[in-house]
Amino acid sequence: MTTLHVHSTSPARRLVRRAVNTALVAAAVGALVYVERQTPVEQEGAGAARIPLAAFAQQPAPPRISTSWFCPGVAAGDGLSAGRVVIANPTEAEVTAAVTLLSADGQEQRQVLVPARTQKSVDVLNGRTVGVVVPIVEVIGALASVEQQSEFAAGDVTASCTTATSSTWYFADGVTLDGSSMRIMITNPFPETAVVDVAFTTVDGRRRPTSLQGLLIAPRSVRSLSMPDEGAADEQRVAVEVKTTTGKVVAARAQHYLGGGRLGYSTMLGVPQRLSKWWFAGGNTGANIVEQLVLFNPAEDDITVDAVFTGAGLSGDVANGVAAPSATTSVAVPAGEVVVVNAGNVEGLPEGVHGISVSTKDGSTFVAEHVINQRVAKSNFTAVMTGAPDELATTTWRVPSGVTPGTPRALTFVNTTVFDATVRVSAIGPGGEFPIPSLQTIPLPASGVTVIDMPLDATTGELIIESDQPIVVQRRLSRGRQLVGFSGVLALPQTGANSR
């Protein structure tokens, strides 16, 4: 475990450091543009190292001169009451961040100072009640991290941000029944126009409307597409593909669920590429719970996807390093179609929490999302989560905005190996990184799942989760306003730890 040491710094030295950081941020923003225009790899930020699956949300490894965080965007037009980015600085030095807000009104820039070992919340709406605002945060180095938070009457949401753009983005899940809204927000953070083609798939098949081909996304701007207005109204399933023919972008989805068995709000980044294996940490079956895996095959060939459910009582004896799962299902996903797997129909799957891996034996790639619809008392809620790439299962995860003390079932750990693991949770406080005493030797069985409550005396600071085996970590969050249920979001895997 890394310890952050505290050193005293004179006021004059702090002023010099602040001036240097400001200059570095300005230089890094310019370098961001230069690197993107000169190289085809999906990396941004001065000194960015080549990292695997760069456009997936993750904590990049140093050394980096600066890191750009691209957030999904806040849909003020949906009626949100607040939107913000949270910048977490775990280091012993003040960090300077440049925050750029992109909207239909152009761009707004500001400089933010984040004191050592703290988090800084930055409002992104500034009173706006229409349109979409997309925050981009440029920070010095690679250790600070960023998340986006939205407050809405239908449920508060925390969303991950990413440190890279991509030429492709996919969304497996989507619903527009009974007036449910669905926005696809496409952001071009660069000084040259991006050209984008958008297709969507419903139960009637794939469509490529002429109006969604060759879309021009102006430099440093955001384009919001209302899918019901684009020909996908009153649909039970809407999967979306965003592909650029020129440039790279960031694409996100905002959903307000009003029908079709769903209720609530979600905002999240899309999936930047198809993969052959995904992990989900928030599985749960039981009374009044409908758990679904949404599988999208944008390719030209049919595929078969295997879903394996892991957890207590779900794995047999380990032979030759491989556990024999007792709850599995295989499903054919035709080319260009979406297939939904109802976990409640999987033979041998007991009620309760579990992890899930979905994969193909032949390496065919696809996109997957996980949906929980649950009835609580006289209300219900919907929680939608993206999966973690198998390659990003790792031994260190971070939670930039922390977890509210006393939150029940706050963190879920899934062991992606056939070896027993031990997990420990630390936090960032005024004196640096420190262990949370009751969370230092958390057992996580081979191919198992462990769920923990956050202690009442825990800090609200950034969390660091470490394991001696590769794991996947998901956080559970309150929806606020005394609403029933929860929302879920993956923690940030730390690049450079012992990932696969």
Regions found by a protein language model. Give the residues of each.
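Terminal targeting segments of Actinobacterial cell-envelope proteins
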Residues: 1-16
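Hydrophobic alpha-helical membrane segments, chiefly transmembrane helices and signal peptide h-regions
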Residues: 17-38, 97, 240-242, 305, ...
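Conserved functional hotspot residues at active sites or interaction interfaces
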Residues: 21-25, 32-84, 144-189, 248-298, ...
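Post-signal-peptide, soluble extracytosolic/periplasmic N-terminal scaffold domains
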Residues: 43-44, 51-57, 76, 86-116, ...
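Intrinsically disordered, low-complexity Pro/Gly/Ser/Thr-rich segments with frequent PxxP/GP/PP motifs
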Residues: 49-52, 102-130, 134, 206-235, ...
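Short acidic, flexible loop segments centered on an aromatic residue
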Residues: 84, 88-107, 138, 186-208, ...
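Hydrophobic, ordered structural segments
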Residues: 113-114, 118-158, 189, 223-261, ...
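Long, internal scaffold/assembly segments composed of regular secondary structure
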Residues: 216, 243, 274-344
